[in-house]
A protein has these predicted regions:
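Short, conserved catalytic or adaptor-binding loops enriched in Gly and charged residues
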Residues: 4-6, 75-76, 132-134
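Conserved core of the sugar-phosphate nucleotidyltransferase
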Residues: 47-120
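A conserved acidic beta->alpha catalytic loop
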Residues: 1
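Conserved beta-strand segments of alpha/beta enzyme cores
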Residues: 9-11, 80, 139-141
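Conserved alpha/beta core of the MobA/IspD/sugar-nucleotide pyrophosphorylase nucleotidyltransferase superfamily
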Residues: 94-174
Length: 174
């Protein structure tokens, strides 16, 4: 509710299948919303406000140039993503922020539906639609970001480290 007061154009979509399928199920629910839009993972804190720009001229995915990573990354040629993989050398570590122009957004709408409904499709990450399964339909540019621009929060303790207002909460038990 706090976000809606500050940003009344935000639309929240509840995915009751999030425990049963991979994140492609969430993308499938909003597949018609990708045109001229940013997509952001919910576990990111943006420290550089210039990450979100008023104008984008081509579809892109944020990545940080690294020598080695065991995280999701992509290779590129002439600034275009050529391959997504888990772990790599001399590549771009993938950050969960991307932008899609109108043409790519239209293609994403149909490609997500196609992949979602194929055998094994519900186990895919949505990014695999554009960066792997249907990659020949797209020219996704690498948009480079740097250390300190974005922080990923994977645990409650990591959240408490950057936001002391959560210190009053005790450790969550399973």
């Amino acid at each position: 509710e706090v976000l809606l007061k500050k940003y009344p154009n935000i639309k929240f979509v509840y995915n009751d299948k999030y425990n049963e399928m991979n994140n492609i199920s969430s993308a499938y629910m909003v597949k018609d919303k990708f045109k001229n839009s940013y997509v952001l993972e919910s576990d990111l804190v943006l420290y550089n406000p210039d990450i979100i720009r008023k104008y984008e001229y081509y579809s892109n995915f944020l990545g940080k140039k690294v020598d080695v990573t065991d995280d999701w990354c992509f290779e590129s040629k002439n600034g275009i993503i050529t391959k997504e993989k888990l772990g790599g050398y001399n590549c771009y570590q993938m950050y969960g922020i991307s932008y899609y122009n109108e043409d790519d957004g239209k293609k994403i709408e149909s490609d997500i539906a196609k992949v979602f409904n194929m055998p094994g499709g519900k186990e895919k990450y949505w990014e695999q639609v554009i960066l792997d399964v249907c990659k020949n339909n797209y020219k996704i540019h690498v948009r480079e970001c740097h250390d300190g621009d974005i922080i990923e929060i994977d645990t409650f303790n990591e959240l408490k480290q950057i936001d002391k207002s959560y210190d009053c909460y005790k450790k969550v038990r399973k």
